[in-house]
């Protein structure tokens, strides 16, 4: 097995040069050893008993022209999801107020678009401004962006932009053909250049190999800056999509993925995203032990079910977890230590 240094040696500074063999060596560690290393890294950057809560609202559901094999919002598949218009501003604000009242500190708005069109930018910008005025962090996922659009979203008060890599470059073509991996990387670059925080992760349990999970995490960690938020989604199978009936991912492998994400991106929030509704409390507890410190809160994630808010509150009480409330006014991304050194040198 490839040698991997003790946890104390891997927390000193963030890395952006991970190889697939190195990440696979992490995955292959004995389970308890891997969890120990992840928890050690986690404690160097976070209070291990605090979890940040976000709420995700679909502001434009269905009708997407892309062919993501996991997504019930694609027009290419016969699913229960039907195309709907953009939600009115007041409906979005009502959802945001309710989310804040239940303990969410970040409000995420998702639209089933291939890319943000100019005619939709102004109403979305208004939503961002009004949600931020409520004292919440703001996040959107709107697809690819055109020239100058990221800057205009930033000016409206946007804190985070979500754009996932989904999986490894090698497996990517099995999941989507209507958007390239490079398209995704270019969108992330636009977001960074505009001074917006990046939310970027992927989906596991789509029939990929462990090497693909390692490849996804390596590509995330090797970005010029680590994403501030890393959502780890476990596939929610929806009848009518090509991935309905995909083999279930072993629960311990999911925990290993969370632990490796924590080690590779030590200062990022690692979020348990889609798929929590089918996770046992024990599995979620293992994920928190492995370094997950954020969840999506609320009974629906875009179009898929999520645990009830009462259930999440009870789980937090049983585990002694506290809510983390970041400042609502999020500053521009601060360079990582190694970037400061290279810039000044």
From Swiss-Prot:
Binding of [2Fe-2S] cluster, residues: 108, 139, 199, 271
Family under the similarity heading: Belongs to the radical SAM superfamily. Biotin synthase family.
Any GO BP annotation: biotin biosynthetic process
Entry-linked HAMAP family: BioB
Function: Catalyzes the conversion of dethiobiotin (DTB) to biotin by the insertion of a sulfur atom into dethiobiotin via a radical-based mechanism.
Catalytic function, reaction form: (4R,5S)-dethiobiotin + (sulfur carrier)-SH + 2 reduced [2Fe-2S]-[ferredoxin] + 2 S-adenosyl-L-methionine = (sulfur carrier)-H + biotin + 2 5'-deoxyadenosine + 2 L-methionine + 2 oxidized [2Fe-2S]-[ferredoxin]
Cofactor, how bound (note): Binds 1 [4Fe-4S] cluster. The cluster is coordinated with 3 cysteines and an exchangeable S-adenosyl-L-methionine.
Pfam families documented for this protein: BATS (PF06968), Radical_SAM (PF04055)
Lineage top rank: taxon: Bacteria
Protein name in UniProt: Biotin synthase
Annotated organism of origin: Nitrosococcus oceani (strain ATCC 19707 / BCRC 17464 / JCM 30415 / NCIMB 11848 / C-107)
Enzyme Commission number(s): 2.8.1.6
């Amino acid at each position: 097995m490839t040698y991997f240094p003790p946890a104390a040696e891997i927390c000193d500074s963030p890395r952006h040069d991970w190889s697939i063999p190195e990440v696979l060596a992490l995955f292959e560690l004995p389970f308890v050893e891997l969890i120990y290393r992840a928890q050690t890294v986690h404690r160097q950057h976070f209070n291990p008993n605090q979890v940040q809560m976000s709420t995700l609202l679909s502001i434009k559901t269905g009708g997407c022209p892309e062919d993501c094999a996991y997504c019930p919002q694609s027009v290419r598949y016969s699913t229960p999801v039907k195309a709907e218009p953009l939600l009115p501003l007041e409906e979005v604000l009502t959802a945001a107020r309710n989310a804040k009242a239940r303990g969410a500190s970040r409000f995420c708005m998702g639209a089933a678009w291939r890319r943000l069109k100019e005619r939709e930018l102004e109403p979305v910008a208004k939503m961002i401004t009004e949600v931020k005025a409520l004292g919440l962090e703001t996040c959107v996922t709107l697809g690819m962006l055109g020239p100058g659009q990221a800057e205009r979203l930033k000016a409206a008060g946007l804190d985070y932009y979500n754009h996932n890599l989904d999986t490894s470059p090698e497996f990517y073509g099995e999941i989507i053909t209507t958007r390239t991996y490079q398209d995704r990387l270019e969108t992330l670059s636009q977001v960074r250049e505009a001074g917006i925080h990046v939310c970027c992760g992927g989906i596991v349990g789509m029939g990929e190999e462990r090497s693909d999970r390692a490849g996804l995490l390596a590509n995330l960690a090797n970005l010029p800056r680590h994403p501030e938020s890393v959502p780890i989604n476990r596939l929610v199978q929806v009848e009518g999509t090509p991935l309905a009936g995909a083999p279930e991912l072993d629960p311990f492998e999911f925990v290993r993925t969370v632990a490796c994400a924590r080690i590779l991106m030590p200062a990022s929030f690692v979020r348990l995203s889609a798929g929590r509704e089918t996770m046992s409390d024990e599995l979620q507890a293992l994920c928190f032990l492995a370094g997950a410190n954020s969840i999506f809160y609320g009974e629906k994630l875009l179009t898929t079910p999520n645990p009830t808010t009462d259930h999440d509150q009870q789980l937090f009480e049983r585990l002694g977890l506290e809510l983390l409330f970041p400042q609502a006014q999020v500053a521009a991304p601060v360079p990582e230590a190694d970037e400061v050194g290279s810039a000044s040198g």
